[in-house]
Amino acid sequence: MTRKKTNPFVAHHLLAKIEKVNRKEEKETIVTWSRASSILPTMVGHTIAIHNGKEHIPIYITNPMVGRKLGEFVPTRHFTSYENARKDTKSRR
């Protein structure tokens, strides 16, 4: 028996907001906390502000993004380089 393919997850409130904006035919930023939602073809052309844990970062949705998750495009961590640590060890010598 083969496995059944499941439908992509999209939060209901996000889908409702997108349909509402599509009916208005106006461009406005949609704010969401749902990073786990998949990107559907109906979202193409919209700007969605995705929460990264601290603030909402606006992302413009294009065709190559369809099928991926919203959270993939907004990093949650900020990498601080190790250069400062290396400079300190050189000055101690």
From Swiss-Prot:
Residue ranges that the Swiss-Prot or TrEMBL entry lists as coiled coil: none
Family statement drawn from the similarity comment of this UniProt entry: Belongs to the universal ribosomal protein uS19 family.
GO molecular function: rRNA binding; structural constituent of ribosome
Protein function: Protein S19 forms a complex with S13 that binds strongly to the 16S ribosomal RNA.
GO CC terms, sorted: chloroplast; mitochondrial small ribosomal subunit
Name of the protein in its database record: Small ribosomal subunit protein uS19c
Subcellular location: Plastid, Chloroplast
UniProt keyword list: Chloroplast, Plastid, Ribonucleoprotein, Ribosomal protein, RNA-binding, rRNA-binding
PANTHER family for this protein: RIBOSOMAL PROTEIN S19P FAMILY MEMBER, SMALL RIBOSOMAL SUBUNIT PROTEIN US19M
Domain of life assignment: Eukaryota
NCBIfam families noted in UniProt: rpsS_bact
Protein's gene: rps19
Signal peptide feature range: none
Source organism per UniProt: Agrostis stolonifera (Creeping bentgrass)
Pfam families: Ribosomal_S19
Alphabetical GO biological process terms: ribosomal small subunit assembly; translation
